[in-house]
Amino acid sequence: MPQMHAVRRDRAAAVAAGLGADAVLVTSGVNVRYLTGLVSSNSAVLIPAPGTAVLATDSRYAGTAERGCPEIELLVERDVARALIDLARAGGLGTVAFEDHVMTVHAHRELTGGEPGQAGPELIGAGSAVDQLRMVKDEEEITLLERACSITAQAFSAVLDRLRPGVTEREYALALERTMIDLGADGLAFDSIVASGPNGAIPHHIPGGRRFEPGDLVTVDCGAQCGGYHADMTRTVALGKPSAWQREIYQIVTEAQAAGVAAVRPGMDVSDLDAVARDMIEATGHGGHFGHGLGHGVGLEIHEAPIIGYDRDGTLQDRVPITIEPGIYLPDRGGVRIEDTLVVRAGAGAAGSAQPLTTITRELLVL
C-alpha cells in the first residue's frame, strides 16, 4: 500500500509540474486519502515537484498517520493548510497549486494573507486535476468495488420479502441498510432511496412513513461501501400485477438501459453515451420525464468523474467504473429507474466493452 500511494503522489507531482507550480497542496479529504491512505476530517498533503511529500494532520489522527503512512513526512498541526503553506514558504517554493474547486474563499484569504513582510508562495488554481487522477482505477480498486456491488446485490435479495404492503419506506430502508452491514460492508455508500407509489416520481426521494400498497411500483437505490469504494444500484419492483402504464415505462427504461450498457467502449464521448439511452426514451414521448444524466463515475466518492450527460465533456477510458441509470418519472403517478455499476474495459477489438459489477436481474420483479 505505501508503494501504491507513492506512485499516486508521483502522479500528483506531475500535475503540479504541468501547471508550472513547484508543488501541489491537496486539502480535500478524499484526495488526501487517495494519496496517503489516511482517513480523517482534518488533513492536507503538500507534494513538491520534485521533493518529499509532507502530510499534515492534527493530534487526533497523528498516531494513525504514523502507523499507516510511515513513508511520508508528518507534520502535526491543527491548521493543516496554513502549516503546509508556511513550510512551502520556508522551503523557498515560489508557486503552489491548490484545489480551488473545494477551498472556500475565506480559507484562501487566510492562506494568502500571511504576516506583514512575508513573501509567497503564490497560489494558483489546480481545478479538479487531482480528482481526475482518481478516475482510472487499478485492479485493487476494482476488486473493492466488485465486493461492494456483490454485498449490495446480496442485501437487496435478502430483504425482498420486506417489500410488501404495510411496510413503510423507512422500515424497508433500515432493514436493507442493516443487512448490507451484516454482510460485511464497511458502511453505506449513501442513504438509501426508497420511493413507493407516487413518490417514485421523485428521483432522490427520502424514505418516509408512507406504507407500501398493492399496485405500487417501488424504486430502491442503494449501495454498500467497502474499503472506501462505493457501489450504486437501482431496481424498481412491482407489488402485485403491474398496470399497463407501469409495464410500458418499465419496458422503455429496461431497453434504454440495456442499450446504454451495450454501447459502452473506451474512447466514447460521454455525451454520445447519454444520447444512446436518451434518444430511445425521447422517441417514446417520455423525454421530458427523464431529467437527469445517464450516469456517473464511482469510486472513493459516490459521484465522481466522468459525469455522463448530454451537456458534459469527456471520454470513457479503460478501467473507469461508471453507472448507467436511465429513468422515467411521471408526476403524481410513479416512476422507474434501473441502474447498474460497471467497468469500462478495453477489449480484444477496438470497441471494448463493459464489465458488469451489478448482478441482479433487470427483469421486472413482481412481488
Question: Predicted segments — roles?
Answer:
Residues 1-367:
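Active-site neighborhoods and metal-handling regions in enzymes and metal-associated proteins
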